[in-house]
Amino acid sequence: MKIKKHIKVLVCIIISAVMFISCTNNDIADEGNENEQPNENIEQPNDEPIPASVCYTANESGSISVIDLETNKVVDTIKTDGVTHNVQVSPDGKILAATIAIPLVENTEMHENGKVLFYDTSSNELINQVEVGKHPAHVEFSRNGKYAVVANNQDNTASIIDMQNYTVINTIETGEGPHGLRIARDSILVYVANMGEDSISVLSLVNFSNISKKVIGKTPVTTAVSPDDRIILASLKGEDALAIYDMSSGNIDKVPVGKGPAQVYMQSDGNYAYVANEGTEESPSNSISKVNLGTKTVEANIEVGNGAHGVVVSDDNKFVYVTNKYDATVSVIDNSTNEVIATIPVEKEPNGITLK
């Protein structure tokens, strides 16, 4: 009898243990399932581009116009102390850089060392300034935010500015007459248009050197880089053309555009490029050439103001903004219709343009 009693107790213990383990496993499984459920309170990442809210123009008359893109009106004018040639907003949207050229003698082409002014975009107040080379043309931020690179047109150099402490940490020799530049998305290579020798210099932000040079065409003014860093564009003022350089094959195709092309800008998806056709002061052009980069043809020539110079496209590719140098205006183009929907008066001689 005692043996049977012990067996019954043992069976009860085993059954209880099995039930306990089963319940415990179910609880763990339920807890795991709960953890796998999405938390609606956590904001999910959004890959959609944020529409631009502010536009800045570099006015060579000595100012920066600040345009509210909700109203397409100038809401502020920042006075500078020299020829304001180009502007660029940092990748995080917090800093505006502007290149300032300082002529040695009024109304001459000879310059002393220029500078880059840095502004807080939340207040439009000056936060720092850095001396660079003679006649600084374009300034561009690396995508990682570490550097600002400046093309010094009369020094044949590029200044590398460390954005942590606002100091020039290196000066790299380029070709003759560097002007427009763009930095690859990997923040490693810089492509500089050398107006004086028909070439593009490729600079390294790793070892701060000029690693190569490519003959691209007559009088390249500015460059653009495709999203995959494989295609380089250059506006060729001396040929009235857009050069399309495929770095993987080495081929260069040229697309005829308007007279005296100045800046070129590529859509964020790499499908189209926009070339501002400036012409000359005596015979200004007034168009934007919209180039299909797949077919390498001009799909539209859009009439804007006289002396179209600077061009930028919103990240969502809905709008194109153009500075009209000889009209002192900015044209706003609806990219879906290729029509100008607004013309905004700014200060005299608007040149570079950027969005925040």
Model features per residue range: what roles?
Residues K2-L10:
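Bacterial N-terminal signal peptides that target proteins for export
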Residues M19-S22:
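C-terminal motif of bacterial Sec signal peptides marking the signal peptidase cleavage site
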Residues T24-K356:
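Predominantly soluble domains enriched in secretory-pathway, periplasmic, or organellar proteins
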Residues I14-A17:
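Alpha-helical transmembrane segments
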